């Protein structure tokens, strides 16, 4: 309602915005309703159409650029690593088997006394400890699965050590006979090389060949297993027969010639009865060790030995 018209009394403004009543003048104020056209100013809300600007997010389609990852097919170029098969040339290390000869050279200078019994028992303990540590390394192709025979051999070695110590104690109390025939010692001293030399040589071969770690070539190809076709190269592990060169350790037979030198020194020895007993115990222990070594399945690659389960 505008102008000089004053709404008083029973004057009622209806929806059609027509002033009626005592004013006398009926005036359509509908022209003012058009002022409400400002409400459509809310059309600015569709300005939110800028939100579709998020279409830039599909720019992440660059992620498929990771197709370059199959470029890792160059990793099979590591097949040159099998050139490390030349490492078994280190089988010349068994030449160090001559070092145990120094042990016998010192024994040759000894005379049959009570000191021989103690020294031989200490040597037997040291050789057992060395062979025990080397046996732990001998299962380098079993992928972490321990050999059950090791536990049995440990239990068998304990009473043998105690028996050697008891014999040493008993022999201290008994008088020693320095006139024992040299021929009797020849048969005994022939067993000494088996006790001191042969077990270390066979185990040194297995220990020295551990650095070949042919497993590294396998583990490096495992990341390439994302390319299933590349896994077809895993049969390249046919290089395992190449390890058949390990039997080239027939040089151990050369080590058997060493007892010939020990016999020459043995003819010069004059030992006590204690030597015969302690040496026989050492020979028994070496036989047990060589028996457990035969069971070492170095090409089974983690597959347990069925005889172990039995």
UniProtKB/Swiss-Prot annotation:
- UniProt entry tagged with the keyword Acetylation: no
Q: For the region 13 X 6 AA tandem repeats of V-V-[TI]-[QE]-E-[PH], what residue ranges are annotated?
A: 29-106
Q: Please give the residue ranges the record annotates as the region Disordered.
A: 53-310
InterPro entries named among the record's database cross-references: CRAM_rpt (IPR009745), Trappin_transglut-bd_rpt (IPR019541)
UniProt biased composition (Polar residues):
176-190, 236-263
Which Pfam families does this UniProt record tie to the protein? Cementoin, CRAM_rpt
Could you tell me what this protein is called? 300 kDa antigen AG231
